[in-house]
């Protein structure tokens, strides 16, 4: 995943961080690489947010924990966005498209049903992406999505009426 993280930005965002995967791990890797990026961890659960703050403090990680619903926020700005086991792909694509005004890329973790989910998502979205096989599971893969655009739906039943005045 670190190969896909935009190291030239100031912020990396982890959506629905949960117990810290991948946000805390990436923050730790960036600290060891001596990179000056801040990781924004979005987790609406109070208990998980407390855990993330404690881990970040003890490991002296450069993180900021947002205990709020990311869907309620608008005009977010970041470099890379990471999404692992957060919400279904179409919902995450819509969230990024609607709520982030600036971002470099979306790193999306796909599980064993990922191919089918991804193919279905491509019916509604135009995506510029690179796919990378998972190192830990042969059925999984990562997507590095650089551009997200909604496809325009064509209504088959559109009728044209001519009105004469």
Across the structure, where does each feature detected by a protein language model lie?
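Active-site capping/gating segments
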Residues: 113-165
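Short amphipathic alpha-helical segments
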Residues: 53-54, 93-96, 119-121
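Short glycine-/small-residue-rich Rossmann-like dinucleotide-binding loops
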Residues: 85-86
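A conserved beta-strand element that flanks and buttresses the S-adenosyl-L-methionine
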Residues: 82
């Amino acid at each position: 995943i670190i190969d896909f993280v935009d190291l030239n930005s100031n912020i990396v965002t982890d959506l629905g961080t949960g117990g810290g995967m991948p946000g805390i791990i990436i923050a730790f890797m960036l600290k060891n690489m001596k990179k000056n990026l801040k990781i924004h961890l979005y987790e609406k659960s109070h208990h998980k947010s407390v855990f993330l703050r404690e881990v970040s403090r003890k490991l002296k990680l450069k993180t900021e924990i947002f205990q709020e619903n990311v869907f309620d926020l608008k005009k977010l700005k970041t470099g890379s966005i990471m999404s692992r086991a957060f919400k279904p792909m179409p919902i995450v694509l819509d969230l990024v498209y609607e709520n982030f005004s600036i971002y470099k890329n979306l790193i999306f973790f796909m599980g064993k049903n990922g191919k089918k989910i991804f193919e279905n998502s491509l019916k509604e979205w135009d995506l510029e992406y690179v796919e990378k096989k998972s190192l830990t599971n042969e059925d999984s893969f990562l997507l590095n999505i650089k551009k997200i655009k909604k496809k325009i739906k064509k209504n088959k039943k559109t009728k044209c009426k001519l009105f004469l005045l």
